[in-house]
A protein has these predicted regions:
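Short glycine-rich loop/turn motifs
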Residues: 17-20
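Active-site-proximal loop/helix of nucleotide/amide-processing enzymes and allied scaffolds
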Residues: 4, 10-15, 26, 35-104
């Protein structure tokens, strides 16, 4: 479900943008919040019932590794929601979806 959502939302976006998706324990999407990758701040909102959180980052130039800002946003999410699984998904028209999992 999450890979399809990443493809639908982000693959055909041609500038860096990120999205935080909150998913419950039944794999239902609870919230979706898009924001500028460079200015995440308070935009990274996580639903209180989330069992898994996906941080999606669009890389229109085809970069397969996280941007430094992706890693900063990931660390900020970890601080907000300790103990919840966070999945980083990098998307782009040329690369499709690449998922990176991080242990809790």
């Amino acid at each position: 479900m999450i890979r399809k959502l990443a493809e639908e939302l982000m693959i055909h976006v041609y500038y860096p943008v990120s999205t935080v998706v909150s998913i419950d324990d039944k794999d239902n999407c609870l919230t979706v919040r898009m924001f500028d990758t460079l200015f995440a701040g308070d935009c990274m909102v996580v639903h209180p019932d989330a069992a898994v959180v996906c941080l999606m980052s669009n890389h229109p130039e085809g970069r397969r590794e996280p941007y430094p800002q992706d890693l900063e946003n990931l660390e900020a999410l970890k601080a907000k929601i300790p103990g919840i699984e966070i999945r980083l998904i990098i998307t782009g028209e040329d690369i499709g979806c690449i998922e990176i999992s991080f242990p809790t």
